[in-house]
């Protein structure tokens, strides 16, 4: 499994089958990039200029919304993950 460093998080992007308004299944080329994902790993956090550790606000299992073009995609064990900084997260879905 991936263990993120500092203030990074590892996400499993939730792929959803996209359909047009008329019910036609869209190809992956015509779909919007998903912005919702499940947090699968969280780094320790990052220290500020005073030396205080600032922990990420998310935890494993959270569903989050993230910046559209943020992060780096990584494939591991046949699965695709997204690694990004916690500052690229926009919201936690409750």
Curated annotation (Swiss-Prot):
Its main location: cytoplasm. It is found in: Cytoplasm. Coiled coil: none annotated. One of its GO terms (cellular component) is cytoplasm. InterPro entries: Chaperonin_GroES (IPR020818), Chaperonin_GroES_sf (IPR037124), Chaprnonin_Cpn10_CS (IPR018369), GroES-like_sf (IPR011032). PROSITE patterns: CHAPERONINS_CPN10. Keywords: Chaperone, Cytoplasm. GO terms for molecular function: ATP binding; metal ion binding; protein folding chaperone; protein-folding chaperone binding; unfolded protein binding. SUPFAM superfamilies: GroES-like. One of its GO terms (biological process) is chaperone cofactor-dependent protein refolding. Belongs to the GroES chaperonin family. Heptamer of 7 subunits arranged in a ring. Interacts with the chaperonin GroEL. Together with the chaperonin GroEL, plays an essential role in assisting protein folding. The GroEL-GroES system forms a nano-cage that allows encapsulation of the non-native substrate proteins and provides a physical environment optimized to promote and accelerate protein folding. GroES binds to the apical surface of the GroEL ring, thereby capping the opening of the GroEL channel. This is Co-chaperonin GroES. It comes from Lactococcus lactis subsp. lactis (strain IL1403).
């Amino acid at each position: 499994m991936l263990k993120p460093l500092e203030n990074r998080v590892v996400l499993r992007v939730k792929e959803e089958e996209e359909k047009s308004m008329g019910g036609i299944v869209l190809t992956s080329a015509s779909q919007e990039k998903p912005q919702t994902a499940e947090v699968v790993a969280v780094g320790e956090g990052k220290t500020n200029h005073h030396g205080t550790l600032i922990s990420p606000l998310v935890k494993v299992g959270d569903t989050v919304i993230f910046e559209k073009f943020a992060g780096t995609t990584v494939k591991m064990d046949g699965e695709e993950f997204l690694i990004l900084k916690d500052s690229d997260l926009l919201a936690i879905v409750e």
